[in-house]
Structure formats: C-alpha cells, structure tokens
Amino acid sequence: MQGTKKALFVGGLLLAVVSSGVQAEALQPDPAWQQGKLDNGFTWQLLTTPQRPGDRVELRLVVNAGSLLENAQQVGFAHFLPRLALAPGDKLSAAQRPSMWTRDANSSRVLPPVVVSYDFTSYNLSLPNNRPELLKEALTWLSESAGQMAFDEKSLQAALKVPDQVATFPVNPQDPSWRYRLKGSPLLAHDPAQDVKPPLNGEQLQQFYKTWYTPDAMTLYIVGHVDNRSVIEQIGKVFSPLEGKREAPAPLPTLSPLPPQAISLMNNNVQQDTLSLMWDAPWHPIRESQALVRYWLGDMTREAMFWHLQQALEKSSLKSNNLRFDCNVFYTRSQCAIHMDVPNSEAVEPGVTFMARELATLREKGLTQQEFDALIARKTDELNKLFATYARTSTDILMDQRLRSQQNGVVDIAPEQYQKLRQTYLSALTLDMLNQELHQQLAQDTTLMLIQQPGEPEANMKALQETYDQIMTPTAEPVASAAAAAPEEKKPQETAPVAQ
C-alpha cells in the first residue's frame, strides 16, 4: 500500500508543480489551423504552410462511414463505394489522375487514393504545389465522390473491372495478431477489406450511400502553401450543394481489454519469430494541461525503459536480436509493446529471460542518475530545436499528425504553448518521480505474445509465462505489499493517458 500511495503522491506533486507554473490551463487549439462549418453540416480544416512553399498540397476528405455500418445484405459496400469513385469516367479523366496521386520521384511514401476502415473512409489527394486550377478540380472530384456518384449499371460494371486500389486500416485486417486483438469486439465481423459479392444490387448500394455519406459526417483537411481565402471560397462553392443528414448515429467501434494470458500465433507472412510484451490500458483524450503532463510522464518513462533495454541488449549475448518499441491507440484503448525479433523458436526462452530480468531489475532499482540526466538532456535539446524541427516538417507529416490528434481526442496546440508547457514539465521532473512512474508501469499486467513463422512446432506459452512470472515476481515482503495494494494500483492507470 505504501508504494501505491507514494506513486500517487509523487505523480500528484509533479502535476501540482507544473500546474502552478501554467495555471492548469485548458489547451488552446493552434490558431494556425483555420476551421469552418457550412450550413449543411460539412466541416473543413485548413493549415497554410508558407514555410514549406515547395511541398505538395495534401487533401483528405474523411467520411465517418466504414464497414461497421454494414448489415448482412451490405457486406463490402463501404469498400466498393471508393472503387466506384475511382473508376474512370466523365468526372475523373485519365489525364487528371496521375497529378492527383503520384508523389515526387524521390518520395518513399506511397499514398493510397482511398483508405477504408471500420468507422471511416478517407479520400486522399496529393497535388503539385502552385497548381490552383488542379486544386479546384480536386475539390470538385471530392465533392462529387461525397454526394453525386452515379449508380447505373454501366458505372457499376466499370468499377468492378478496374483493379482494386482501395487500401484498408489496418493494412491487413486478417493479420493473426490483429484478429486476436479484436476478440470480443463487433469489429471482428466487419472486415473493411471485404469486397462486394455478385450480383451487386445497385439500389441497395445507393441507399447505403445516401444514408451514411451525408455532409454532417464529413470533414475536409487541407495542408499546403495555398491562398486560404480562395480555397475557403471554393470549399463553400463545391460542398454547399451536398444534401442529407444522419437520421441515426453510427455505432462506435470498441475493443475489449487485451487478455493477460500468454498466446502464440502462427503467421505465414513472417520469416522470423517475434516475442512481444504488451501493455493495454484505456485511452483518455488530452484537452487540458494536467492530462498532457500525465501523458508526458508515461511517455518519457516508456522511452527510458526501452533505451535501458536496448543498451543492455547491446552488451549481452543476444545483441544480434532486434528490439523494437511502439505505442498505438485503437478505439479508446492504448497499447504499448516491446518487440524482440528472434531467428526461431529456440531463441524465444532466452529472449523472455533477458527481458524479464532487465525489467525486474529496472522496476526495483530504477534508472540511475546518469541515465536520467542523459534523458533530460536529450529532451531539452529536442525542445530547443522545436521551431527548426517544425519548419522542416513536410506537409504530409503535418497532415498525418493532425488526423491522429483528431482521431485520439488530442488538442493540437501551437508550438509556443507546447514549448512553454514542455519546459515547465522538464524543469519539474525528478529522478524519483520518473522511477516511481516506472515502478508503477511495470506493476501492471503484461500480455506475452509470440508470433511464429510457419512450420515451427507451437511454443509452450505456459512454460514461457512461468519463466517470466518467476523472474518478475518480487521477493516475499513486496509480494504481500503488492497484493494489498492491488485494488488501488489500477486507479492511476485509469486516469493517466498513455502513448499514441
């Protein structure tokens, strides 16, 4: 119980220190992002980037409609509608298409023209800079796709004959680890990659389109060096005629908590095994400074934990293994994981033993003052380069960041407010605070997952779990204390946002 109370006190102390410096202010949206709403409910967001005059102009029309809306007679409709929009016809000539989607030759990123998921469809365009006439054509095409598609037999057949260019999120909804993550969720029965099955009923498809493709469920995002006054005027001109209104709200996608039981999954598309330690928790929006501080504290702690493991791995006999770390938010759940790539199943147990020993030591001893000082120095250096980094951030990255913030309920703040809050936070943070957060995070339930390559015998996950638990279990006295504190240890987790 004492450890839990101390963690709560230290976390509260940091919040108090930071909040006193910034007066616990609400996060103010970055005014550089202009926003508007038309009379029909259509919304738009625009970021002009004079600091990036040579970048392409990025457009995303996000419709809050995906495969989760389909019933048994409508399977594949959400995926087929973009195919219909992309089919060559009077509205989109073959000459226009390359300019709207082809990136520069030196770009490594591939932009799919449309992405369909469970709860959204995103129409994506990337235009050459300084081509205002092409921007007008792009806005017109987006408007026509959003509310003026034709459903005659000729159009339907043309769409069926064109190769499917529509991507999905996630990229592979049939990935074994993703399917396992969806267990207990209605999403499992609504694959966004599912295409329509013949015969295609045009009337049913059109009704689905009119029901869910309504202007009050659409947002247009634009990032680039454009004439904002002209663009805003054009948006009103081409999107105001859209009609319709949602008569019923769309169902919200949800995920169940990740089961703590160890699991092994076979994946035919991998050539090595991957051992993962996964932490799953609720995600909470970030709209005020205290929530942002909680997020930063958890995020820096996870980063410190990963770099500690990385340095230990480089000094061990397992240094040929690759170590990765990621955090993602999926439908109000946050999932962070440490992944170790190993050549085969025989290397799994040494990997489990290594990670458990290092994490157990880190939980009990914490970071050293030297490690903490290095972390603060690195973060301070990043903060000092904030405006230079922002000036170098390309329009496609700025767009991705905006969409992620919108999806996760995070208020995008101006660089000036970010710098002020971040500096106050870094100045208030101490080694003891970070180590208490580290101890708390490593006391949470962890799911052990193993992705195996085809042809291998299935790993004994029960034995691997026992190996992990034996190392991670504290000595007798802390066990009793942890057992007494168990009901309260989850409380800080419920209130602390975690990494995106």
Predicted regions and their residues:
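M16/MPP (pitrilysin/insulinase) zinc-metallopeptidase core fold and M16-derived inactive scaffolds
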Residues: 58-126, 187-191, 199, 303-324, ...
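An aromatic/glycine/proline-enriched structural segment found at the starts
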Residues: 219-276, 280-284, 455-456, 462-490
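Buried hydrophobic packing residues in well-ordered domains
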Residues: 41, 61, 79-80, 123, ...
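C-terminal regions of mature proteins
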Residues: 25-26, 219-224, 376, 380-500
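N-terminal signal peptide c-region/cleavage motif recognized by signal peptidases
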Residues: 16-21
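Acidic/histidine-enriched segments that form metal/cofactor-coordinating
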Residues: 98-208, 277, 353-357, 367-399
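Non-catalytic, conformational "gating/processing" segments within enzyme and secreted inhibitor domains
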Residues: 202-237, 445-447
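Histidine-acidic residue clusters that define the catalytic metal-binding segment
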Residues: 25-34, 170, 177-218, 252-254, ...
